[in-house]
Amino acid sequence: MARRRRRHRGPRRPRPPGPTGAVPTAQSQVTSTPNSEPVVRSAPAAAPPPPPAGGPPPSCSLLLRQWLQVPESASDDDDDDDWPDSPPPEPAPEARPTAAAPRPRSPPPGAGPGGGADPSHPPSRPFRLPPRLALRLRVTAEHLARLRLRRAGGEGAPEPPATPATPATPATPATPATPARVRFSPHVRVRHLVVWASAARLARRGSWARERADRARFRRRVAEAEAVIGPCLGPKARARALARGAGPANSV
């Protein structure tokens, strides 16, 4: 297997160093001289701009300058023109409208420039309540009117005629005011309530009724048992039982 021969390269030609701080920039010029390397001639570096008054120090990086907040001096006034949403400046005292001078009234949206109707704006429709709300308000108003009539002198009674107002006499301590009397309405309403008899009966009954029925049933059953067993436990029945036991024994 043949080995590959490595090519021998001679020593590299050293590159002459350029001037210190020569960096090709937009203001630099590249010139070449015969039998020599190109030389970069850069313009003198411009001095950095002085930091603004009250701004961040020049040692801060660009990122820190964007996020660093330096308090402004109290003498600087904010310019309202820099803010688009700022309110308009207040007018001068002589330009302010006075109370005597009438303010110009803006025409309604449906009026034209001459005061007539503007065909571009349709006339506004009158406000109308929904049907259900109107019905509810009407029923409520009628109910309140009936309540007023009932409180005044009974339901269905005609309203008393309006009497001219008489001057009120001042009450003296010698004549005490008459106490108010209770007036009953001459119109009486009777409302019949229809209920199920079984539901009313069950409502009248309760746990006490069930316990009373159980006690009565227990007494009745005890009396029936005493009527059957009572004669067997009397003195005569005991004597007969003892005489039967004292007799001759039963033969097997």
Swiss-Prot record:
Motif position, Nuclear export signal:
129-138
User: What residue spans carry the region label Important for interferon resistance?
Assistant: 194-252
- Region: Interaction with host PPP1CA, residue numbers: 179-192
Q: Where is the composition biased (Low complexity)?
A: 165-179
Q: Which InterPro entries match?
A: PPP1R15
Q: Where is this region: Disordered?
A: 1-129, 150-179
Where is the sequence biased in composition, kind Pro residues?
46-59, 85-94, 120-129
One GO term (biological process): symbiont-mediated suppression of host autophagy
Q: Where is this region: Interaction with host EIF2S1/EIF-2ALPHA?
A: 222-237
Other known facts: ICP34.5 is detected as early as 3 hpi prior to viral replication but reaches maximal levels late in infection. ICP34.5 gene is therefore classified as gamma-1 or leaky late gene.
Query: PANTHER family under this entry?
Result: GH11727P, PROTEIN PHOSPHATASE 1 REGULATORY SUBUNIT 15A
- According to UniProt, the name of this protein is Neurovirulence factor ICP34.5
Q: Which organism is it from?
A: Human herpesvirus 1 (strain CVG-2) (HHV-1)
Gene name?
Answer: RL1
